Amino acid sequence: MAVYADEKQRTFTLQTKNTTYQMKVDAYGMLLHTYYGEKTDNSDLSYRIPMDDRGFSGYAYEASCADDRLSSDLAPQEYSCFGTGDYRISALRVRNENGSQAVTLCYAGYELSRGKYSIPGLPAVYADETEAETLGILLRDPESGLEVLLQYGVLEELDIITRAVKVVNRTMGKVVLLKAASMCLDWLSGDYEWLTFYGKHAMERTLQRTPIAHGISAIGSVRGASSHHYNPFAVVCEKDTNETKGLCYGVSFVYSGEFLMETEKDQIDQTRLICGIHPDDFAWTLEPGESFDTPEVILSCSSEGFGKLSHNFHQVIREHICRGEWKNKRRPVLINNWEGTYFDFTGDKLVSIAKDAAELGVELFVMDDGWFGKRDDDRSGLGDWFPNEKKLGCSLKELGDRIVGLGMKFGIWFEPECISEDSDLYRAHPDWAVKIPGRKPNLSRHQMILDFSRKDVQDYILERLCSVLASAPISYVKWDFNRSICDKYSTSLPAEKQGEMAHRFMLGLYRVLDGMLSAYPHLLLEGCSGGGGRFDAGMLYYSPQIWCSDDTDAIERLQIQYGTSFGYPVSTMGAHVSAVPNHQTGRVTPLATRGCVAMAGTFGYELDLNKMTEEEKVEVKRQIEVFKQYYDLVSDGSYFRLTSPQDNNCVVWEMAEKDASKALISAVYQHVQTNCAAKFVYPRGLCSDASYEVSLTDLKGDKKDRMQKQVLTGAALMRGGLRLPGADSDYAAWQIYLKKL
């Protein structure tokens, strides 16, 4: 049993394998947060809450004749409200019909159930009755009648707790939600830091570690998507926490739209974290009887450092976010023509690339942007999802059949949420584009946004997508989104509901994705937003892999994939071998290094194989063989960050089988050093008393012996370390295979 409700002591305790989370109802009905951390018993932990009288921190009216020391401004609250005495960052803010913004939430009941709750129209962790339990706690404003249902999903074996909120208008009038966060989490004490993951286009999710100081710190997005700039995943940790030790808490927002994560350290050094939809673009009207569901937050806690925390998130995403046929099925090695041809291609040109790829073992050919409408550059054609048979020289079906005839699968690129001003769709439906009446729209990549908050737009796009998918043997779709949203306005919404547009857009996107996958359940969907501009748990609910970044440079990818790995498994990271000089940086890196880095992801190619030498093709064929050999480690192994690219010349990572039977260690030198010291790394996840054969993987296919095989115990490897081969040139890479004997 994972959820314990003690009606006598009025506590709710959530127990996972290694952690405990507890709440308590106080004498005045306030739901307090007492504890989240290492596993303990079900004892009432409210004794930890300080009861001190502090000036300018008020108390409830009912407490004036009793104990006036418990103030909402100081108490650790499970779901904080604006306007009634808590001056810290709040989770809920409303505008009542009389214009006031006050809300007081008091405990009104609870419900327990087996299995995991779901959220209408939104992605969420899923689990059956053997895997999860649900706790619902009902809070009510005694004055207005507004109700808030706090929902908790407990996946005991995974050390995962999920949270979501349903707000129900039980008042007699209209209520406007100005802020409705998915969670509030308070820490009574501790000197914390937090890890956030910032970036930009083509350089996403760079790790940043900063102290949580007095005042408010925040990350978020008002771009209509989770964005390249801040990822909706963060970690709060104690100061001495590292990969293998220390207490840390992870927060992942299961949402692909605008978000806000904010922390505040208050007057008595307590820390609060709020996570939810960004309130700047949000105002949701609830008529009497109507309700609003927030997106979900995934929480996990580890006392064994960032490595264990990452494993918790990797497992819940692989097993309880990713769905469908491709959740566990081996995904094909693909080649994408984008960096090989850009818009300049014909059907014959694509088939020639595919033919070379098939001979080398590539299993899926993906035709990227430029196959539809009038689309020879990025200035026109978006929205006209009809194959350009004149450009291709054949029908889409004929092209697909030719690809399939090579023994490959056929994939295709879409950008359904965007529209070109120079398109037949825009000329027919200019009101479908997102723009403010009387203002010239802001353009990005010469394109505008389709109003996915409108059901007629959703229905049209879904019909077009399904029509294209039905017309050819298409097994894969790359779903792109190449700009941020601004000029937010929908012609389908009245003025007072324009604050709903951004969230309705996201609900519309999820509806279309769900509709397409329901119609084509065998389809492999890869998410993309100019690379990693929408890399979040929400999109992973629909697409089990996401193009990690438009930056395909192997050395830059070390940083990008390192940061991404804190919250997301490598099996979700789209990673390709591209041409050199690299198209983003101009850097020339060895083919073996490019392959090694791409193998820390879904693995594929993005270049014109016709331009490769025969020696390079032999190396490509060998890379594909190696990746297939170690695929299980990539798809389901435990991932360890052995060194960081931020402070190490040699970047090393490990993927180990959960039963410790084998492991693959990959190392990339960012530059060569003269007369450098020996480099040791310390593998993890091995069996101490077992022996392992240690051998170098032949990435190049030339069968040269670059490291002598040896046999070492797991204890020796993990404590004595493994000496890596040195770098004989800039960007040298090695893969070392450990096999249990």
Region spans (language model):
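Glycine-rich, aromatic-flanked loop segments that form ligand/cofactor-binding clefts
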Residues: D73-K116, K245-G257, C301-E325, V362-D369, ...
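Active-site neighborhood of glycoside hydrolase catalytic domains
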Residues: G393-S395, H429, A433-P590, T602, ...
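Conserved, mostly hydrophobic/aromatic
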Residues: N18, V165, G289, I335, ...
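Polysaccharide-binding surfaces and accessory modules of carbohydrate-active proteins
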Residues: A5, R10-K17, Y21, L31-E264, ...
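Short Pro-Gly-centered flexible turn/kink motifs
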Residues: S100-Y107, W284-S303, Y731-L738
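Carbohydrate-binding surface patches
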Residues: E243, S644-C687
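C-terminal beta-sandwich/jelly-roll accessory domains of carbohydrate-active enzymes
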Residues: H671-L741
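Aromatic-lined carbohydrate-binding/catalytic grooves of carbohydrate-active enzymes
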Residues: W326-E463, Y476
